[in-house]
Design a protein with these regions (language model features):
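Sequence context surrounding c-type heme c attachment/ligation sites in exported
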Residues: 1-202
Length: 202
């Protein structure tokens, strides 16, 4: 990542299974559906800093590609159909990111206008790419291992362990506080991707 790189230790920290992993949650205990659907809320969990927010913000955003942006760019809704309930899922992910990196909202956002990218710190772009990186790793590398993982390494719904921000960051704004991993492990550096040349059509 950037100029520092990552190794197995970045996530594993000397353990066979990284400490910060997640599985898709089964929100409703069997037989409780006659009392209504809590939608994964009001069950405090460490991943959302023990708040009442939905406690599995990872499945919709780091496994699926649900819309994270909730507020519109205009004072009135003007076609924005996102609800408060949907917004709470976004807040759940943002709370997780905040605690995982040891930062607050203004590390990535200009709180004057959350809907605008103008005037935001460069970390917002990094976070945008980080969300997509986590999703790609979950979908393209971990999910295909479903049949390989033994049953004792799977979640309650039979899914494999997946990663989120805390898997690598573990409370630091840069994993391992930016320790240079490439310097001691140059053999892990992949070959640069070939440059794409646009073909000129007559």
């Amino acid at each position: 990542v950037a100029e520092t790189g990552v190794t197995c230790y970045t996530c594993h920290r000397g353990q066979p299974v990284p400490s910060a992993i997640w599985f898709t949650q089964s929100h409703e205990p069997q037989g409780s559906n006659f009392m209504g659907d809590k939608a994964g809320q009001n069950e405090p969990a460490a991943v959302v800093n023990l708040s009442s927010l939905p406690n599995d913000p990872f499945t919709p955003f780091l496994l699926q590609a649900k819309d994270i942006r909730m507020n519109g760019p205009t004072p009135l809704p003007s076609g924005n159909r996102h609800s408060t309930k949907q917004t709470e899922w976004t807040y759940g992910l943002m709370t997780h990111m905040s605690t995982s990196l040891g930062v607050n909202c203004t590390y990535c956002h200009n709180s004057r206008s959350f809907s605008s990218w103008e005037g935001n710190p460069p970390q917002r772009v990094t976070a945008w790419h980080g969300i997509r990186m986590a999703r790609e790793l979950n979908l393209n590398y971990l999910e295909p291992l479903q049949a390989t993982f033994p049953s004792n390494r799977k979640g309650e719904l039979g899914d494999v362990a997946k990663l989120n921000c805390a898997t690598c960051h573990q409370g630091a704004y840069k994993p391992l506080n930016g320790a240079p991993m490439i310097k001691n492990h140059p053999e892990l550096v992949g070959k640069p991707a070939p440059a794409q040349v646009a073909s000129a059509k007559p």
